[in-house]
Amino acid sequence: MANRGGRHARNEDSENTINYVQCDGLAVMKMIKHCHEESSNMDLAQGALLGLVVDKCLEITNCFPFPKSGDETMDEEMYQLTVMRRLRRVNVDHLHVGWYQSSDVGNSLSLALLESQYHYQTSIEESVVVVYDTQKSSRGFLCLKAYRLTPQAIQMYKDGDFTPEAFRTLKVGYESLFAEIPIVIKNSPLTNIMMSELNELLPEDKGHNFLDLGTASVLENHMRSLIERVDELYQEAVRYNKYQQVVFKQDTEKHRALAKLAAENAVRTSKGEPTVPEEEVIKQFRPMPVPARLTATITSGQINTHAQHIAQFCSQSLAKLFITESLQNAKETKEIK
C-alpha cells in the first residue's frame, strides 16, 4: 500500500481546506460489498477512491478495489491506471482522492495505515482514508469514518525521528496522529424515491432484532483484542525500561571514569606532565540508540479504541436490558388483566 499514492503530485505544504467528505451512495455500497466479501475470507479489503474537490468538500463519486496482494503476476500500478483510464472514457470521475480499507473489531489504527496515508497525503494533498468496520456494521450500526494525518504526524514522518524527544517536541500522541473528517452520504433524488417505495414494501419490524441480548461474542472479541494490545504495550514498556537502565549504567560509568581522569590530571599537573583530554574517555562510551516509540504509541491508540468500543457496547446492552425488562413487565401486566 505504501507506494499506491505516488501520482498526481501536489504541494505538500498547502493548507488543508477539506471540511467534510461527501460520499455518493453507489460508492458506499461498492465499498460495503467489497469489505464484506473479503471479511468472509479474513482478508483486509482495500481500494481506491475517485472523485473531486469542490470548495471545501471532498466528493467521493466512485471507487474500485485493489487486486489481492497474493497475485504476484498483477502489476498494481498498471491495474489502477487502466481502471482510471477506462472510467475517463465513459465520462466518470477518475481523479484519485484517497483509498479505503476494511476494519475488524474497531481496530483500524496500525503502522501500515499510517505509512500508506503518509505516502498518499504527501503526493495527493486532499487524500483521505475511509475505514469501514465490517463487524460493527453487521450489527446494524453503519460505521464509516474518514481520516487524515495531522500536520504534526506528517512532520514526524518527514523527519523520520520517532524518539520520545521528537514526540514531546511535536506534541504527538495516539490521539493526534489522525484527524477525523466528517463524512456524509448523498443520494440522488431518484434513489431517495426508490428507497421510500422499497421501505413501504418491507414488512413492519417488530424490533426483536434490536433487543437481542445474545451478543456476548462481540464483547469477548473486544476483550481478547484488548488483552493482546495491553500485553504488547507491556513488552514495549519492558524494552524501554531496559534501555533506560543501560543508559543510566553507562552514564554512571562515564562519570566515574571522568572523575578518575580528573584526579589523574591533577597529579600530572602537579608533576608538570601534559594532561589527558576528556574526549579520550568520552569517545569510549558510545551513545545508545534510542528505541522508537511509534509502535508503543499506536498500541496505546488501539487500547483506547477498544476501551471506547467496550464502554459503548456495554451502555447499549444495559439500555437493551432495561427496555426488554419494561416490555416484559408490560406484557405480563396485560396478560393478568
Curated annotation (Swiss-Prot):
Family that this chain belongs to: Belongs to the eIF-3 subunit H family.
Disulfide bonds: none
Gene Ontology terms describing biological process: formation of cytoplasmic translation initiation complex; positive regulation of Notch signaling pathway
Species of provenance: Drosophila mojavensis (Fruit fly)
Assembly and binders: Component of the eukaryotic translation initiation factor 3 (eIF-3) complex. The eIF-3 complex interacts with pix. Interacts with mxt.
Highest taxon of source: Eukaryota
Keyword Metal-binding part of the UniProt annotation: no
A molecular function (GO) term: metallopeptidase activity
Keyword Phosphoprotein annotated: no
Pfam families: eIF3h_C, JAB
Domain MPN: 21-153
Gene3D superfamilies reported for this sequence: Cytidine Deaminase, domain 2
Gene: eIF-3p40
Keyword list, A-Z: Cytoplasm, Initiation factor, Protein biosynthesis
PROSITE patterns in the cross-refs: MPN
Protein name: Eukaryotic translation initiation factor 3 subunit H
Localization (cell): Cytoplasm
InterPro entries on file: eIF3h, eIF3h_C, JAMM/MPN+_dom, JAMM_MPN+_peptidase_M67A, MPN
Lineage, highest ranks first: Eukaryota, Metazoa, Ecdysozoa, Arthropoda, Hexapoda
GO cellular component: eukaryotic 43S preinitiation complex; eukaryotic 48S preinitiation complex; eukaryotic translation initiation factor 3 complex
Function: Component of the eukaryotic translation initiation factor 3 (eIF-3) complex, which is involved in protein synthesis of a specialized repertoire of mRNAs and, together with other initiation factors, stimulates binding of mRNA and methionyl-tRNAi to the 40S ribosome. The eIF-3 complex specifically targets and initiates translation of a subset of mRNAs involved in cell proliferation.
